[in-house]
Amino acid sequence: MKVKPSVKPICDKCKVIRRHGRVMVICENLRHKQRQG
């Protein structure tokens, strides 16, 4: 999980979602998991 000021999808399978007011990227490649904060 990377915590970044701005999250962007890295590959085609990355999905940008909102959980509890936080913007997150989930992907089947676990290296692409990101959270804004």
From Swiss-Prot:
Keyword Ribonucleoprotein: yes
Matches recorded under PROSITE patterns: RIBOSOMAL_L36
Record's GO cellular component terms: cytoplasm; ribonucleoprotein complex; ribosome
Top-rank taxon: Bacteria
Record's signal peptide: none
InterPro entries per the UniProt record, alphabetical: Ribosomal_bL36, Ribosomal_bL36_sp
A single GO BP: translation
Gene Ontology MF annotations: structural constituent of ribosome
Keywords: Ribonucleoprotein, Ribosomal protein
Family per similarity comment: Belongs to the bacterial ribosomal protein bL36 family.
Protein name: Large ribosomal subunit protein bL36
Gene name for this UniProt entry: rpmJ
